[in-house]
From Swiss-Prot:
Pfam families: TPR_CcmH_CycH (PF23914)
Protein name as annotated: Formate-dependent nitrite reductase complex subunit NrfG
Organism encoding this protein: Escherichia coli (strain K12)
Consequence of gene disruption: Triple nrfE-nrfF-nrfG deletion mutants no longer attach heme 1 (covalently attached to 'Cys-122', the CWSCK motif) of cytochrome c552 (AC P0ABK9).
Top-level taxon in the UniProt lineage: Bacteria
Length: 198
């Protein structure tokens, strides 16, 4: 007995159908979706700066460090700085005050508190802000942040001579915390505006 021959066309169609079914089921599987997501992530030119750099991740990391060691004033200060950059002045003040309570009298922390208060008051020098600056400068007459805040406020009030004097003092300190190029530009701008007033 001869077995019936399956036509070649039918065999080809069945083979193609099988291939499509296999590929289709693979493409619908979760494994393929994970591979595809990873491929797209790798193609993103910013993939190296992924989620660990997001503000939420930074905040979570800082909070985890503080939970692990709540007596670390440095981490509290970093938390204050984080909130300042997020324009969350209330939480920034709380964090900086906690850092100050843990560390004790500290010029940098008083200057940081002054900065938060200054921006919270829409860049106006309040009595409370001035008190924090005075405390910072009493502890360290060369405290960069306090001097820069005074210079910026003088500039905002069109007291260009005072701004130039303070910025020059900061420049003469040769601190690595200072962007000298930006400082020179600020001094030159103040000089230009001063000449216009004269």
């Amino acid at each position: 007995m001869k077995q019936p021959k399956i036509p070649v066309k039918m065999l080809t169609t069945l083979t193609i159908l099988m291939v499509f079914l296999c590929v289709g089921s693979y493409l619908l599987s979760p494994k393929w979706q994970a591979v595809r997501a990873e491929y797209q992530r790798q193609r993103d030119p910013l993939h190296q700066f992924a989620s660990q750099q997001t503000p939420e991740a930074q905040l979570q990391a800082l909070q985890d460090k503080i939970r692990a060691n709540p007596q670390n004033s440095e981490q509290w200060a970093l938390l204050g700085e984080y909130y300042l950059w997020q324009n969350d002045y209330s939480n920034s003040l709380l964090a900086y005050r906690q850092a100050l309570q843990l560390r004790g009298e500290n010029a940098e922390l008083y200057a940081a508190l002054a900065t938060v208060l200054y921006y919270q008051a829409s860049q106006h020098m309040t009595a409370q802000t001035r008190a924090m600056i005075d405390k910072a400068l009493a502890l360290d007459s060369n405290e960069i942040t306090a001097l820069m805040l005074l210079a910026s406020d003088a500039f905002m009030q069109a007291n260009y001579a005072q701004a130039i004097e303070l910025w020059q003092k900061v420049m003469d300190l040769n601190s690595p915390r200072v962007n000298r190029t930006q400082l020179v530009e600020s001094i030159n701008m103040a000089k230009l505006l001063q000449r216009r007033l004269d």
